[in-house]
Structures are given as C-alpha cells and as structure tokens.
UniProtKB/Swiss-Prot annotation:
This is Putative phosphatidylglycerol/phosphatidylinositol transfer protein DDB_G0282107. Catalyzes the intermembrane transfer of phosphatidylglycerol and phosphatidylinositol. InterPro entries: GM2-AP_sf (IPR036846), Ig_E-set (IPR014756), ML_dom (IPR003172), NPC2-like (IPR039670). Residues 1-21 form the signal peptide. One of its GO terms (molecular function) is sterol binding. Monomer. Belongs to the NPC2 family. The keyword Nucleotide-binding does not apply. It comes from the Eukaryota. Keywords: Glycoprotein, Lipid transport, Signal, Transport. The keyword Lipoprotein does not apply. Glycans are attached at residue 42. Pfam families: E1_DerP2_DerF2.
Amino acid sequence: MKQKLLLFIFSILILLIAAEAKMFKDIWKSCGKSTDTFQIKNVTISPDPPVRGQTVSIYASGELKDTISGGDVNIQIKFGIITIIRETKPICSSDNPFPCPIQPGDYTHSVDIAIPDNAPRGKYSGNFVLTDQANDEIACINVNMQL
C-alpha cells in the first residue's frame, strides 16, 4: 500500500514538473488578429533565462504587410499581477534601426529591458502592442519568462 502511495505521489510530481517545463517552453503568444499589419513569426529572449542585473533583449520577427510612417510600441511588464513597467516608445525614433516610413517586408526588431539587481525571482509577463500612425493595432505579443 505504501509503495502504491509513493508511486502515485511520484507520478503527480513528474506531471507537475512536465507541466511547468511545457508552460515555459513557448515564451510567447500572439495576441493580435489575423488582419494585423505585422504578422509575428517568432519571438526570442536573450539571455534565456534572463539574469538579474543585466539587460534582457526581446526579439520579434515577422512580416510587415503595409507601409508604416509612425506609431508606438506600448510596453507593459508584470510580476505576477503587479505592473512594474508601463511605457510607450515611438516606432519612428532616432534609435530605431528602420527609418520611417518602414516599407513592407520581413523584419526583426528588439526591445531591451534592464533587469534590476534586486528584482524578485518569479514569473514575469510582458505585453507589447504596436500601433501605427492612425493608432490602429499592427501587432500584439504576450511574453512569459521566469527569473
């Protein structure tokens, strides 16, 4: 009887570990629409996993269907349910590697976020919404990572 109980507990632990590993295997999900101007193909983070006291770079690659002459990237980072970063950055700025207007084609773009030395360990989530010059959504990405 004791062996069956231990086997049951061991099986549950294996399932929980597998579920946790699967949950963080895919760090991103598109929250956009199929009609979005920028169709996201892939998102990666570097370093993976992120390290406290360093900058994490989040790279998104995809295909831009229409010309963009302006707009913003709205960034929201949460620790659990607590919002810790909320900022808006212009798509057309001096530090953007793609001068505006941005022509249709395949692109990779990154956002760098400094992680403080004292950032608590745990699950972080990010939401990145890109809008064009008319404030219409052109892409949306949700990112999950463990620190």
